[in-house]
Design a protein with these regions (language model features):
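Ankyrin-repeat and related helical/solenoid repeat scaffolds used for protein-protein interactions
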Residues: 270-290, 294, 299-303, 625-628, ...
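Extracellular "leader-to-stem" segments immediately downstream of a signal peptide or signal-anchor
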Residues: 2-6, 15-83, 91, 96-98, ...
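C-terminal, well-structured subdomains that either form a transmembrane helix-short loop-helix hairpin
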Residues: 411, 566, 574-589, 644
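Conserved metal-binding segment of the jelly-roll/cupin
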Residues: 81-88, 92-94, 102-104, 409-422, ...
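Active/binding-pocket-proximal capping segment
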Residues: 592-607
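Glycine-rich phosphate-binding "P-loop"
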Residues: 51-62, 218-220, 383-396, 552-554, ...
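Sequence-structural signature of mature extracellular/luminal beta-sheet repeat domains
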Residues: 693-968
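Long, structured stretches of catalytic cores involved in phosphate-ester chemistry, encompassing
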Residues: 573, 617-628
Length: 968
């Protein structure tokens, strides 16, 4: 038995960089084949001449046979592995890689997929892919193959090289637009002129090398909008740029870029959340980094510890043309940050640039990888060779325990390995699988030892201070084991958990590939009636000095109380791309934790499980870096939550790149809230935030609270007497604040959902309504506009007719009711605002119209204006406010950017100022210059100017209704 070796990658790029050939003799080539022997797996497909009519010397076209092998996995287990042995495999057409299928190469050398010179069909056009990550295989041949999407998990290519020869200038090696937990791993991309290595990006690219081509990576937003990681990789001799990107939320760690014009180019008029650290730029002839959209908070650039050699222009802002250039041949970018900055939580943020760049006399050695490499596969022991069954029925507990007692590295081929008690690893034990969807260690429901009340009992446990690797498996605690914690991790900082799925909830499959039902019919409870969410301990519990590297982990199990709980550890810990979703109370908790670095933490709340879930709770902790953190609420949410991050008794927390978002109107009230000081951070896009020691907040808000206790109020309007009206969507209610009597009045409760309000000239209350069974921003529902007398709503409700604009005499149009916010329009906002509107609703007065835009029901507020006037419209998704003219037919024309701020409402005041509801109330003058802000205790949604003398600003703000007197 060979001892398992932990080999850290010292100077891994030196293997391709002759100028830095200082590699120690005992360092393993990270770009060699990582699986040098065949790994037996009865449920996998082997792409060999024995099983398919192929050759492995590049002499024949194997395209159809390779597609057949992939299809066979889909037809048998649905999600699984195709093993490809060493050799050269020539293809001539696109290969569809179905959802959840992995291609894994093995042999002394990696197998090579070859597109030969001048292969027909790859000379021009788009979509000329060698490999296309796609969704599920269509059931009928007549159905179109769908691109991978936000539901495409666990597809991958590993330990396989791709070579595109000359004369295929339209070829793209991989179309990679999938969701989390897919990968391109341990690959070489040898490209020719015109080629792109990877088009659109997914979760992770690791240990990949890109040679030649126009671009190594050319990408937009990932399919689900999550972050992406490029780690321990190399780029050389791309003709245009190594990476062209927009909104990929890109983490670039320990990469080497050499002999290219540009390292990262952010597309024009687009933003990027970009983190680069511990990397090297060498011989870069044009600006190494090109930043666009520099004045927008979505642009978040954070760069740390980059060594530059022969790179005269480090960075250029595309809009202004400003460059950061240096004369020194060698220099280190110790820190660079651009975007919305909070020096601390007590100061007002601003968009700014900071940099700390120092010249060097000599380039330091490349930063070693902290990802442990696996031991040679000939030292792995196949658990099935020891008698394990892996069918999900037989009890494999004793066989696993004996294997751990006698062997170091235990390989689990595809299978579900049922156990009945904790599996406890020795200090050097490694558990290796190759596909966590089909390779699981699992409990059945009601496993005896996990019942009742008692201390958390792990399914898998690592020893304190151990050096362990757990990789490529799923950990499944089922739904009725209340003492269960899937993994209790106490191993030390040289350990690793990688490519692990904490099974349960979304994306859970049996061994036949059949999906386990997630929900009941109306998404209010589990699909298995006897299972209840939030009835187990945490999925991953890192404690008692536990640390190490945690990479590409998915924890969406709704039965667990949290996906991640890190407690009582000061050991070094690193998280790379961890997705924690769909819990009821908490997604991730850090308590008494120090010295961790977290890159690409993904947090998501589902409407069924998590409308009241706290995504990230940090207590009693310090010295933690969070790079490119994203907290998201799904489009089906119908209620807000107070904060995405809660801190308590913690300091020296460094957030670099922080986003919170939802496609609906129900945002987080605060991005971050500190419980000790009471300070909340409202902006949703932050480049730089330090949470340090905070004093208690003593300032008083600028507004007076009139009423509270609502769920979420918005849609405000004013009647002719200056009384404000507003809605509480969840409870389907319309309220009025009586200005003279200073009291709240309930106007009505509707059988449909009121969205927004307005009045016509005769005092009729106009209500945009929506009826929908399953709430989602992507489900338009049945949108109607009704009118009523607010003094007698039950007896006067009537539906307004939708009529063509062409049927209206433009001379009769006096008032135009418009959306003061459009919360889903993100790009090309000007075009969307000026898009033709063919129909409208005519109010009972005959002179007030409501243009029927396609997103009429997706607004926080309606406002009234007149033909010939200028209006202001905020875009929540774009976080901008635009000015728009109304023509003589009541249509919207000439949109233009007003300010780089906007969210839920925009109100034009009589004096020309514009009040914009965006975290607080921001007051801009008519030239777009910020004058001041109005501090509101809750996040404002809708604002109107009312009162008897039209001098009171009324503010709908989540659960409270506020006002403030507007001075002359």
């Amino acid at each position: 038995m060979k001892k398992y070796l932990f080999i850290f990658l010292l100077m891994f790029i030196t293997l391709v960089s002759p100028g830095f050939s200082q590699t120690p003799a005992n360092v393993v080539d990270p770009y060699a084949s990582i699986y040098q022997t065949r790994l037996d797996d009865a449920l996998a497909v082997y792409f060999t001449p024995e099983n398919f009519t192929i050759t492995a010397d590049g002499s024949t076209d194997v395209s159809d046979a390779l597609q057949e092998a992939i299809n066979k996995v889909q037809e048998t287990v649905r999600y699984g592995i195709v093993f490809i042995p060493e050799g050269i495999y020539r293809i001539s057409k696109k290969i569809n890689l179905w959802k959840g299928v992995r291609l894994i190469g093995y042999g002394k050398k990696r197998p090579v997929i070859l597109l030969g010179k001048n292969t027909p069909g790859f000379q021009d056009g788009s979509g000329k892919y060698l490999f296309h990550f796609v969704s599920d295989r269509p059931w009928r041949n007549t159905q179109q193959v769908a691109d991978a999407n936000a539901g495409t998990f666990y597809t991958g290519i590993r330990n396989i090289n791709i070579r595109i020869e000359e004369g295929n200038q339209a070829a793209v090696a991989v179309r990679y637009h999938a969701a989390q937990h897919c990968f391109l791993s341990h690959m070489d991309f040898n490209l020719s002129a015109g080629n792109v290595g990877v088009e659109d990006i997914c979760n992770e690219i690791e240990f990949c090398r890109f040679f030649g081509g126009d671009y190594g990576i050319k990408t937009g937003k990932t399919a689900p909008g999550w972050q992406t990681l490029i780690i321990d990789s190399y780029f050389e001799k791309q003709g245009k740029a190594s990476i062209a990107t927009e909104e990929a939320e890109m983490l670039i760690i320990r990469n080497h870029f050499r002999n290219v014009p540009t390292v990262v180019s952010i597309n024009e008029n687009r933003s990027e959340q970009l983190w680069i650290s511990d990397s090297r730029f060498e011989n870069i002839t044009s600006p190494a980094i090109i930043v666009s959209n520099e004045n927008h908070p979505k642009t978040q650039i954070n760069l740390k510890d980059i060594i530059c050699i022969n790179t005269p222009d480090f960075l250029q802002f595309r809009g202004s043309g400003q460059k950061i250039s240096l004369k020194e041949k060698i220099y280190q970018v110790k820190e660079f940050s651009h975007g919305l900055h909070y020096e601390n939580m007590s100061v007002w943020p601003e968009i700014k640039t900071i940099s700390n760049i120092e010249p060097l006399k000599k380039a330091p050695m490349l930063v070693p990888s902290d990802i442990p490499q696996l031991a040679s596969t000939d030292s792995w022991v196949n658990i099935k060779s020891l008698g394990a069954v892996g069918n999900g029925v037989a009890d494999d507990t004793e066989i696993l325990k004996k294997a751990i007692a006698n062997y170091t590295t235990i390989y689990l081929p595809s299978g579900h390995y049922r156990v009945t008690e904790p599996i406890i690893l020795k200090p050097g034990t490694n558990i290796i699988g190759l596909h966590p969807s089909i390779t699981q260690i699992m409990l059945r429901d009601s496993t005896a030892i996990y019942q009742g009340i008692g201390s958390p009992l792990p399914l898998l446990e690592t020893p304190q201070g151990g050096i362990n690797i757990v990789s490529g498996i799923g950990l499944n605690t089922s739904g009725m084991n209340p003492r269960a914690v899937a993994a209790k991790w106490m191993a030390g900082e040289k350990s690793m958990m990688n490519d692990v799925r904490f099974t349960g909830g979304h994306g859970t499959y049996d061994l036949k590939g059949r999906e386990v039902r997630v929900y009941n019919d109306n998404r209010t409870a589990d699909g298995i009636p006897y299972r209840k969410w939030d009835t187990q301990n945490w999925s991953l519990w890192i404690t008692n000095g536990g640390g190490g590297t945690f990479k590409d982990i998915w924890a969406p199990n709704p039965y667990a109380s949290a996906g991640l709980f890190v407690s009582d550890t000061q050991a070094g810990g690193r998280i790379y791309i961890m997705s924690i979703e769909h819990h009821v109370r908490n997604e991730a908790i850090f308590d008494h934790v120090s010295n961790w670095r977290i890159y690409g933490l993904q947090l998501e709340e589902e409407s069924g499980e998590g409308p009241h879930c706290l995504p990230l709770d940090i207590r009693n902790s310090n010295n933690i870096l969070f790079a490119n953190t994203f907290s998201y609420r799904v489009s089906r949410m119908t209620t807000p939550y107070p904060y995405a991050i809660r801190t308590e008794n913690s300091k020296d927390l460094y957030f670099r790149g922080l986003r919170t978002y939802t496609w609906t109107k129900y945002l987080f009230d605060n991005t971050l809230y500190d419980a000790g000081s009471g300070i909340g951070i409202r902006p949703r896009e932050i480049a730089y935030l330090n949470v340090t020691s905070i004093e208690n907040q003593s300032s008083k808000p600028d507004v007076e609270k009139l009423a509270d206790g609502f769920d979420f109020i918005d849609g405000a309007t004013i009647d002719h007497e200056g009384n404000p009206y507003f809605i509480d969507y969840k409870w389907q209610r319309i309220y009025k604040w009586n200005v003279l009597q200073k009291k709240l009045e309930l106007i009505c409760e509707l059988p449909v959902y009121p969205v927004s309000l307005s009045f016509d000239t005769e005092g009729n209350l106009l209500v945009v309504t929506r009826y929908v069974q399953i709430e989602s921003v992507f489900n338009k529902g049945d949108v109607k506009v009704i009118a009523m007398n607010p003094d007698n709503p039950a007896g006067t409700i009537r539906e307004l007719k939708e009529v063509p604009f062409s049927s209206i005499d433009k001379s009769k149009i006096k008032n135009v009711v418009y959306q003061a916010s459009r919360y889903r329009i993100e790009h090309n906002v000007e075009a969307a605002l000026a898009a033709p509107v063919n129909t409208c609703f005519v109010a009972p007065d005959g002179i007030t119209i409501i243009p029927y835009t396609q997103d009429l029901a997706q607004t926080y507020s309606l406002k009234v204006s007149q033909p010939g006037k200028k209006i202001y419209v905020s875009s929540n998704a774009a976080q901008r406010t635009y000015s728009v003219d109304i023509d003589d037919r009541g249509r919207f024309v000439n949109p233009s950017l007003f300010v780089q701020d906007g969210e839920t409402d925009a109100l034009a005041m009589p004096d020309g100022d514009v009040y914009i509801s965006s975290g607080n109330i921001l007051i801009y003058n008519s030239n777009g210059v910020l004058k001041r802000n109005i501090d509101v205790p809750e996040r404002p949604s809708s604002v109107v100017l009312g009162g008897k003398n039209r001098d009171i600003l009324f503010i709908c703000a989540r659960k409270g209704f506020y006002c403030v007197k507007i001075s002359d």
